[in-house]
Amino acid sequence: RGRTMIDGYGRTIEYMRISITDRCNLRCRYCMPDGVDLVSMSDLLSFEEIEEICCVAAELGIKKIKITGGEPLVRRGCTALIGRIKQIPGIEEVTLTTNGVLLAQQMSELCENGLDAVNISLDTLSRCNYEEITGKDKLEYVLEGIQAAVEAGIRVKINSVLQKELNDAEWGQLIGLAKDQPIDVRFIE
């Protein structure tokens, strides 16, 4: 304890992102179109290895762990992994970056395991545009996931990739999500 990591600009590093899978249940055109080669499951870090890495990171001053993917919720045991990481001394916060499709379905387990916050990738509120961007008709599931997280008291941030001539006219609608709910919206180019 007591050791810290400093980046090249003299800033203390307090968080770490861990990608637990490259698999995803969507095929977003800017991220993972069809035909992408996937890593063999045997080449992924085991949850025990991830937990060990988080223990070492905590000893080096890491306080926040961000679980990402691919889509982390497609990996069996993701919710339990969050609980294991939350038990590590020094880890104060665990967040999840997700496309939100499986979020409502797994919300109670995520809450039981101590998830602090969720970042949800959502580029449009138009069902047609959503299917165009992601290759799947799953917008309804994402909106249910957002609502489930808000109702559970989990901090919610929406990450939206702006794409000219596809969803650039929807900025206002996406911002509207945050108008009456405790949701932050962040636009990404």
Which sequence ranges carry the predicted segments?
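Canonical Radical SAM [4Fe-4S] cluster-binding loop centered on the CxxxCxxC motif
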Residues: 8-47, 60
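Short, Lys/Arg-enriched N-terminal segments with co-localized hydrophobic residues
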Residues: 1-4
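Conserved G/P- and acidic residue-centered "switch" motifs that form tight phosphate/ATP-binding loops
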Residues: 71
